[in-house]
């Protein structure tokens, strides 16, 4: 909600406060949040937190193919059942989730519902009907197992022994299917989060040429790529974030305003900034 910090010129700056108001200043807090420590040293923070939900359950749909999974996620997230999470794991990741309430080990789509106990059960029942699911097509993860499942998803457990390259790809949900289909030429393994908009992808071989090709594919579908884990030689030559010329100029001007001598994390986000 707000912060106090010191910029690269040694000036103390403040923004926001302890409550959200419809006044100027909140945009600056959002700017600093996404700056990866390149604009200020933060000395004070005001953060809004939400109470832990009383109950969390997860509807797991068995063995959908990618197109059907995205259809399920799209319908669920636009429904009145108010899901708090939606993810798709292809077949090759299914065996990573051994849970008592999970009755199969193949590909799966998972949709989380949270809130008061009675509300969660009613919304789960309504959602399964809205998606026209049969009992044999689904499993329900109860509170404890639901929390385990989403903790593993958040921590990228399916990639915990990864030795290859890991990319974070964000695209509009309407573009996800086409992007995945085009990236299959690069021996991709992936799972999808954010209800279809976030793709965590690993590639056996990733050169500068292939990375640029992947970025161009994603960019054509209005998305961007972030490097999470890459080999050392590639890390030295490639930018972590996808560079858009217009946004690069804006970022450069912002950097010059906050930190003209480039003291804070130079090159952290973009080469030269």
Predicted features and spans:
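C-terminal substrate-binding/cap subdomain adjacent to the FAD-binding core in PCMH-type
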Residues: 3-162
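Conserved glycine-rich FAD pyrophosphate-binding loop
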Residues: 11, 134-273
